[in-house]
């Protein structure tokens, strides 16, 4: 194919080039390349195909979305004013601001104001134009400037922009809008500005020394950026119209036989049309951006309702009135929300919470302190004493000190009594010290029974008191009997070990009589 870049669909007039037999991979005799529903035989990059045809001007995408011509024109004017004001605050050259406004006008002749945010596209055009004209600005600075302009337009005190998730989302939307602008314009973003052309034409007319005339023509040219003249006429015709209007305003005579603009290829009809469009700006009333945005929102909701009705989601007569302020442009309310329906069923979590509330007072009663100690603490002390008694190994009992204490006892019965006392449940400490030990022992036995029933873990006790043997059942007595047998078994083992230890001790004393003195 002839060139390497594609023009925007619908924006540029089709400029077709003949297909060569070997270039671009096209087969000989082929009619072109079908892209979408259009047939292209080539692409021609030229500034002449950046002008809109008449059919695009008469029926724009915004008009097809339901916006009237006045609202669309107001949005175009406000968007270009925002770009100009932001360029001044960003200290961009005038050429960059002009490029941004032209790109803005071109884009919204291919896309609708209803489907694309005017403010986001304005930011994207400023950011893109600054890079095109070799004066790049950071996207953060662009966002901050537009944020300040919005506050000033709404007559609010400017507040610094917060760097939160909303800022990140806005930044991503602007980047996407910039890509969309490039795609819709076919990456043909070059703009030929009439700034230099005005100075060159005034030099030909020998009026370049009249600074007032030059500045006035320049001002008219900057104001024409808010209109659609840059997508309808050549830059040479726009430059001639700005000079013509400035000379008529300042009452400076210019050659008219023949007319001077004919020398530069402009016609009288084009000059009059451009002057009429520029002067219309000064007779327009100041538009309110909030009113324009509300109109756009109305159209958005109307389109969404039409789509929902086409899909059968909304009945034909259930659409709310768009003019009612109280409706808020939301679809018809449902008789019962899904949250209310879910709330009627009891969830497992709510049942669990109710059980906890019921068990709360029972737990509090069970944890009431007895004799200054909680039941849990009492059971812990009992378990500790039992663990200590159980952990006494035969080796420990067979130590010399233990042997000495055992030999000091009078009878085996007294030995068993001392052992049973040491291994029985230790009574809890009394808060009232004057209480007798016997009553506290009875209370301790009762507490230990309660704890055993609560925890459902029966502990085998080695105490041989008559009160416990009466209260226990047959099964427990059997188990205690078994345990007693076991205890006798361990006791016999300890005795045998102690005897063997005594024998070895006597043997040791015979061999080494000096050491026996120290042991005694």
Curated annotation (Swiss-Prot):
Claim: Transferase is one of the keywords in the record: no
Phosphoserine sites (modified residues): 330, 337, 347, 350, 368
Residue ranges with Basic and acidic residues bias: 356-366, 440-453, 472-481, 489-514
Key word Phosphoprotein present: yes
GO molecular function, a single term: cyclin-dependent protein serine/threonine kinase regulator activity
Family annotation (SMART domains): CYCLIN (SM00385), Cyclin_C (SM01332)
Region (RS): 384-422
Record localization: Nucleus speckle; Nucleus, Nucleoplasm
Any GO BP: regulation of RNA splicing
Location of the region described as Cyclin-like 1 in the Swiss-Prot/TrEMBL record: 81-183
Low complexity biased stretches: 407-429
Extent of Basic residues compositional bias: 454-471
Entry-linked Pfam families: Cyclin_C (PF02984), Cyclin_N (PF00134)
Cellular component terms (Gene Ontology): cyclin-dependent protein kinase holoenzyme complex; nuclear speck; nucleus
Keywords: Cyclin, Nucleus, Phosphoprotein, Repeat, Transcription, Transcription regulation
Region: Disordered, residue numbers: 309-520
Region (Cyclin-like 2): 196-280
Domain remark text: Contains a RS region (arginine-serine dipeptide repeat) within the C-terminal domain which is the hallmark of the SR family of splicing factors. This region probably plays a role in protein-protein interactions.
Subunit-structure text: Interacts with CDK11A, CDK11B, CDK12, CDK13 and POLR2A, the hyperphosphorylated C-terminal domain (CTD) of RNA polymerase II. May form a ternary complex with CDK11B and casein kinase II (CKII). Interacts with pre-mRNA-splicing factors, including at least SRSF1, SRSF2 and SRSF7/SLU7.
Record-stated family: Belongs to the cyclin family. Cyclin L subfamily.
Protein task: Involved in pre-mRNA splicing. May induce cell death, possibly by acting on the transcription and RNA processing of apoptosis-related factors.
Protein name: Cyclin-L2
Species name: Rattus norvegicus (Rat)
């Amino acid at each position: 194919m002839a060139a390497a870049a594609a023009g925007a669909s619908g924006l540029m007039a089709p400029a077709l080039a003949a297909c060569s037999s070997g270039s671009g991979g096209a087969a000989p005799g082929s009619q072109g390349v079908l892209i979408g529903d259009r047939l292209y035989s080539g692409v021609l990059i030229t500034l002449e195909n950046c002008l809109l045809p008449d059919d695009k001007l008469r029926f724009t995408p915004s008009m097809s979305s339901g916006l009237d011509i006045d609202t669309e024109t107001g949005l175009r004017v406000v968007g270009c004013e925002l770009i100009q004001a932001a360029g001044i605050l960003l200290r961009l050259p005038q050429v960059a601001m002009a490029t941004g406004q032209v790109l803005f006008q071109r884009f919204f002749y291919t896309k609708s104001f209803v489907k694309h945010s005017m403010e986001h596209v304005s930011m994207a055009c400023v950011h893109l134009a600054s890079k095109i004209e070799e004066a790049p600005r950071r996207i953060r600075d662009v966002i901050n400037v537009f944020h300040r302009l919005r506050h000033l337009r709404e007559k609010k005190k400017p507040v610094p922009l917060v760097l939160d998730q909303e800022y990140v989302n806005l930044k991503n939307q602007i980047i996407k809008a910039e890509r969309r602008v490039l795609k819709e314009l076919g990456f043909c973003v070059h703009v030929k500005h009439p700034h230099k052309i005005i100075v060159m034409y005034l030099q030909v007319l020998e009026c370049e020394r009249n600074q007032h005339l030059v500045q006035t023509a320049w001002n008219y040219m900057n104001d024409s950026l808010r209109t659609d003249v840059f997508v309808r006429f050549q830059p040479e015709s726009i430059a001639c119209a700005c000079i013509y209007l400035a000379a008529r305003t300042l009452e400076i005579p210019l050659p008219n036989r023949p007319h001077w603009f004919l020398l530069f290829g402009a016609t009288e009809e084009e000059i009059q049309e451009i002057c009429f469009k520029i002067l219309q700006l000064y007779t327009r009333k100041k538009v309110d951006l909030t009113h324009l945005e509300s109109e756009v929102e109305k159209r958005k909701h109307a389109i969404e309702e039409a789509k929902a009705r086409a899909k059968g989601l909304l009945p034909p007569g259930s659409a709310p009135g768009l003019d009612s302020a109280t409706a808020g442009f939301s679809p018809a309310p449902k008789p019962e929300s899904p949250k209310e329906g879910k709330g009627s069923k009891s969830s497992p979590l709510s049942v669990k919470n109710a059980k906890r509330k019921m068990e709360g007072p029972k737990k509090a009663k069970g944890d009431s302190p007895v004799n200054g100690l909680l039941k849990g603490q009492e059971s812990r002390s009992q378990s500790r004493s039992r663990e200590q008694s159980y952990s006494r190994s035969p080796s420990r009992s067979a130590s010399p000190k233990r042997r000495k204490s055992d030999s000091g006892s009078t009878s085996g019965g007294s030995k068993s009594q001392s052992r049973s006392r040491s291994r029985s449940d230790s009574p809890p400490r009394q808060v009232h010290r004057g209480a007798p030990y016997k009553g506290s022992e009875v209370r301790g036995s009762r507490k230990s029974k309660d704890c055993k029933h609560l925890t459902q873990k029966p502990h085998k006790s080695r105490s041989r008191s008559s009160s416990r043997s009466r209260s226990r059942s047959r099964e427990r007595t059997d188990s205690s009997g078994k345990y007693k047998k076991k205890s006798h078994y361990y006791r016999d083992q300890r005795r045998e070990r102690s005897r063997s230890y005594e024998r070895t001790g006597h043997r040791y004393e015979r061999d080494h009589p000096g050491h026996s003195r120290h042991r005694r």
